[in-house]
Amino acid sequence: GVIYLLLLLFCIVQFLGPNHTEVVRIGWLFAVSAVFNALWIICWHYEKLPLSLLVMLGLLVSLIFINIRIAGTSNMLIKAAFGIYLGWICIATIANVTALLVHYQWNGAGISGEIWTIVMILIGMVITVLAIRKFNNPWIGLSVVWAFTGIMIKRQADFRSIVVTAAIAALIVGFFIIKSFILAKNP
């Protein structure tokens, strides 16, 4: 909901707003990301998991390139729209890989599902912190904190270690979000 609303606002503003520099920087990549998004929905709906992962990777790469191109912008709407979108797709890509592994009944190389979940949370946290810093975009972290909060709520009754890991990861990402906003105001 929020991502599509922000993307809709981006579409409206690009026609109404006086600042077209950011729109030109993004260029055709926005259309590419939209095509990948639509294809992913179709692949996921029809449970074409290997294909859905490939399409998701295409979406992820297109969003990375968009975020590279807008790293220097001060336009908050553009940073928020594509930052939140990238953060969500980073986490969704990890979830898509996990779904594919479960589909193929991967045994986790002898490591428990609980430990693998903790590892995936930590990988998501590290990728998010690096992305916030690389793209100078604190918005990337917001959807990741949201995802980690969802994990905490879902797992609170059964896996305390997962809940604690997700909470710590959310706090660390939150720290970098705040730090990035502060640095943006005081360069």
Please tell me what each predicted stretch does:
Residues W139-G150:
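Central hydrophobic cores of alpha-helical transmembrane segments
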Residues I78-G87, W106-M120:
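A loop-to-helix transmembrane entry motif
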Residues G110-V126, M152-G174:
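Membrane-interface transmembrane-helix boundary segments in multi-pass integral membrane proteins
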Residues W40-L53, A71-M76, Y104-I111, A131-F135, ...:
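Membrane-interface helix caps and helix-loop-helix hairpins in membrane proteins
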Residues L57-I68, F148-I151, A170-I177:
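Alpha-helical transmembrane segments and their membrane-interface exit regions
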Residues F15-L16, R69-A71, I177-P187:
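Membrane-interface capping segments at transmembrane-helix boundaries
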Residues L29-I41, V55-I66, A80-T98:
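Alpha-helical transmembrane segments of multi-pass integral membrane proteins
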Residues G1-L53:
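Early transmembrane hairpin module of multi-pass membrane proteins
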